[in-house]
Swiss-Prot record:
Disulfide bonds: none annotated. The gene is cpcT2. This is Chromophore lyase CpcT/CpeT 2. Covalently attaches a chromophore to Cys residue(s) of phycobiliproteins. The keyword Lyase applies.
Length: 202
C-alpha cells in the first residue's frame, strides 16, 4: 500500500508548470520555460510514474527535454525519483498535454532506458519535499566539450516546483554549465493530481 507521503509527492509534481513571473522579473537571467509532468498508467511501472516534458514557452509543442520518472518509497522514508530516457522520443512529443493521455497508455518499460546515476532522493520537510541527485557523480552529461556530472536540487510544494541544475567538472567540481542566478521557480498552472488519485491499480 502506498504511503501518504509518496502519494502527496506524486500529486504535487503532477501538473503543468511555468516560471512566467520569474522570467518577466529577470529576463536576463531566466528564460520563460514550461514544465509539464503527467501521470502515467499504473501498469508502466506497476507503481507511480510521470511523463515529463520541458520546453521554451514560445515553442512549448517541441520540448527539448523529455524524461520518464518512477517514484518509489524506501523503508527509511526516502522517496527515490528514478529517471528514464525514452529510446525514441518522436512518438510521444507533446503527449504530456493531451487531454485523454492516449499515447501515454501505449508506453511500455521496453521503450525506456534507465539512468541510474540520475535518481533524485526526496525527503519530506514539513510542508515541502526537498530532493537532490544521488551523490557519487553518477549522472554524467557531456556538454561544452567536457565530461561533467549533474549537481541537481529540487523543492516541491503543493503549488510550486523549484529546481536548479548545475554541471560540474568530474575532477575539479568547478561549475561548467547551469544556472548561476539561483533556482528556476515554477508555479503550477494546471493540476493533474486528480489523475494520480484516480490511477487504476491491479
Amino acid at each position: 500500500m502506498s504511503s501518504h507521503n509518496l502519494v502527496t509527492l506524486v500529486s504535487w509534481l503532477a501538473g503543468d508548470f511555468s516560471n512566467r513571473e520569474q522570467a518577466w522579473d529577470a529576463p536576463a537571467f531566466f528564460s520563460h520555460i514550461r514544465l509539464c509532468m503527467r501521470p502515467l498508467p499504473w501498469q508502466v511501472f506497476e507503481g507511480y510514474g510521470l511523463y515529463s516534458e520541458q520546453a521554451d514557452d514560445y515553442d512549448w509543442a517541441h520540448p527539448y527535454r523529455i524524461v520518464v520518472l518512477n517514484l518509489v518509497e524506501q523503508p527509511d522514508g526516502i522517496i527515490e525519483c528514478r529517471n528514464y530516457a525514452l529510446k525514441d522520443t518522436a512518438p510521444y512529443l507533446g503527449a504530456a498535454r493531451e487531454a485523454e493521455r492516449a499515447r501515454l497508455h501505449r508506453l511500455t518499460p521496453e521503450q525506456l532506458e534507465p539512468l541510474p546515476g540520475c535518481t533524485f532522493l526526496f525527503k519530506r520537510e514539513g510542508s515541502l519535499f526537498r530532493g537532490r541527485v544521488r551523490p557519487g557523480k553518477g549522472c554524467r552529461v557531456f556538454r561544452k566539450g567536457r565530461d561533467t556530472y549533474l549537481d541537481g536540487e529540487a523543492t516541491v510544494s503543493a503549488d510550486y516546483y523549484k529546481s536548479i541544475d548545475r554541471g560540474r567538472d568530474l575532477e575539479s567540481d568547478e561549475q561548467v554549465w547551469g544556472s548561476v542566478s539561483g533556482p528556476f521557480h515554477f508555479t503550477k498552472q494546471v493540476d493533474f493530481a486528480p489523475e494520480v488519485l484516480a490511477l487504476a491499480r491491479p
